[in-house]
Amino acid sequence: VTSIALAVTAALINQPVLAADDDSDKKKKKGLEVIEVTARKTVENLQEVPVTVTSISADDLQEAGISVITEVQQFSPNTTLQASRGTNSTLTAFIRGVGQQDPLWGYEPGVGIYIDDVYMARPQGAVLDLLDVERIEVLRGPQGTLYGKNTIGGAIKYVTKEMSGESEFNVQGTFGSYNQTDFKITGQIPLVDDKLYLGFGHAMLKRDGFGEFLKVASHLGNQDTENYNKDVTASRLTLEYRPTDDLFMRLAWDSTQDDSNSKGGYRLLPSLLTDAPVPDSVFDSYTSLPTENSVEMDGLSFTLDYTVSDALSLKYIAAKRDGYSDTNIDFDNTDLDIFDVPAIYDDTNTSHELQANYASENFKLVAGAYLYDGE
């Protein structure tokens, strides 16, 4: 699949400059926090963006104990983010009732997921663990003008931190019920003072299952019978270069490996074929397929941001993402070999985006060109 998109947005600002300055002064006097977002492909004050957007900062996420992107729905109204059937890392996303309930590979979802403005084309592997994040932006409503065909419901933007230039090292551990053990390590090292920085992050997230597979087909032999368990490893490396105050370059690599078991469904009625009763727990299931599951996601991106003048800035983003999923979906939830789908999803895509932002005293322009090629 290859697609090319061009987008231009312009706005005339007719309000008197004095009035705008006066409003700004009033806000400063009231002590309102200035929250910057990039919902319209340019840095703006959240209070002044004419888009329905929720911005959740890293401090807010940490204070609320949020570790995965599905929990962001607590902060954003009219937003549903859930792990889908089959795997723990396949995302079902709805905003204002628009989305894709069945996360079929090969179909464009109704809500776009972006990592530093790089589009994640498939729902497989889109349940992102929050590692080295600066903020999450949730844009509600159609965003097709600036984000393309896949955002009729909205868009969710995962924005990672830019490095401060100081040596930093952070270790975070979380322990919980069902033997939950989460470890995250993040840090940054200046390679050349005030110019070149290396950032890194690594996470290991493990948890026993909420339920179990009560019966597994006998011909499969010994199987791990935990259902809804978690075994995820995520890594990120970033190289940032600032040769001048006007030029910024970033090379970033990220990887996610999900070895959690396949997620078994819950029976609402007893089986007519096996007489299997309805499980006591909604997390218990039956299956005739192997319980192992593997999801691998890798991404590489390059960003160049150049401030030409006080009024004009240019940005170029090139990216390549690869995904591979080997999972098993048992639709009938019995130990019989019927309605079973051993699924393998394998995809790769590349994208190139060029953005231009111009802002004068009473005129703003956002223009861009986008090329996407996926298979």
Predicted regions and their residues:
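Outer-membrane beta-barrel domain signature
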Residues: R122-P123, Y147, G173-T174, D224-E226, ...
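Extracytoplasmic loops and strand-loop junctions of Gram-negative outer membrane beta-barrel proteins
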Residues: L139, S167-N170, K215-Q223, S281-S288, ...
